[in-house]
């Protein structure tokens, strides 16, 4: 069974539009979790393809300073994975949601219960950056009969054989990491990045999205030329925190309506 997230993003790719997925931190709002659907609605109204929802955690190894601070603000409001899932169960969204979490909160929640409870939300994808592919069977047996795709991350330093191993049989989309390091770093792209992304996109039979360090309209243009779209996190998180909703809506609209 092809997962909903795969079909949804593939349809956007087939329509010759760039896929645009913004990242937000659950609970990082003046209203805490009560503001989550306000932010989701703002992004939906700007035409996003899907929305990545971050789960705050005390040791976020892949997060840059902006997203790490957002997580700390959320944790200070006593936001938990349990509370986030309960909030997401309250209302269906117009576009698929993708949860980005570390493995420890999932383990503490209980893997089977986690997948079961997520199935009662609009979550259609799952990213766990500190879960190596070799240990994916930690959760894949529970996802197999669900409509939730486990999204693999492929970095620049990943060898060709390893890339193919990660891509073959993957669902949802391929998360292509544009820089080595944490989220939010910009401008330090390797010279062979475009070639790497082009090769990845040519090989994969599901959409390839470029993330980590994507923050400008020029980045959106560049990475749509060599992959199927982009994921933007730190810029969105920072601007939302600074109260720049109109600027966020304008930027997201540009990315979401980018014609190939």
From Swiss-Prot:
What HAMAP family is this protein classified in?
Trp_synth_alpha (MF_00131)
| Assembly information from the UniProt record | Tetramer of two alpha and two beta chains.
Record EC number:
4.2.1.20
**Reaction it catalyzes:** (1S,2R)-1-C-(indol-3-yl)glycerol 3-phosphate + L-serine = D-glyceraldehyde 3-phosphate + L-tryptophan + H2O
Classification via InterPro entries = Aldolase_TIM, RibuloseP-bd_barrel, Trp_synthase_alpha_AS, Trp_synthase_suA
Q: What is the lineage of its organism?
A: Bacteria, Bacillati, Bacillota, Bacilli, Lactobacillales
User: Member of which family?
Assistant: Belongs to the TrpA family.
In which pathway does this enzyme or protein participate?
Amino-acid biosynthesis; L-tryptophan biosynthesis; L-tryptophan from chorismate: step 5/5
Q: Name one GO cellular component term.
A: cytosol
Q: Which Gene3D superfamilies match?
A: Aldolase class I
Checking Pfam families in the record gives: Trp_syntA
Fetch the CDD domains from UniProt: Tryptophan_synthase_alpha
- Asked if rRNA-binding is a keyword of the record, the answer is no
Q: Which PANTHER family match?
A: TRYPTOPHAN SYNTHASE ALPHA CHAIN, CHLOROPLASTIC, TRYPTOPHAN SYNTHASE, ALPHA CHAIN
Function according to Swiss-Prot or TrEMBL:
The alpha subunit is responsible for the aldol cleavage of indoleglycerol phosphate to indole and glyceraldehyde 3-phosphate.
Name this polypeptide is given: Tryptophan synthase alpha chain
Active site location = 52 (proton acceptor), 63 (proton acceptor)
**What keywords were assigned to this record?**
Amino-acid biosynthesis, Aromatic amino acid biosynthesis, Lyase, Tryptophan biosynthesis
Naturally occurring in which organism (per UniProt):
Streptococcus thermophilus (strain ATCC BAA-250 / LMG 18311)
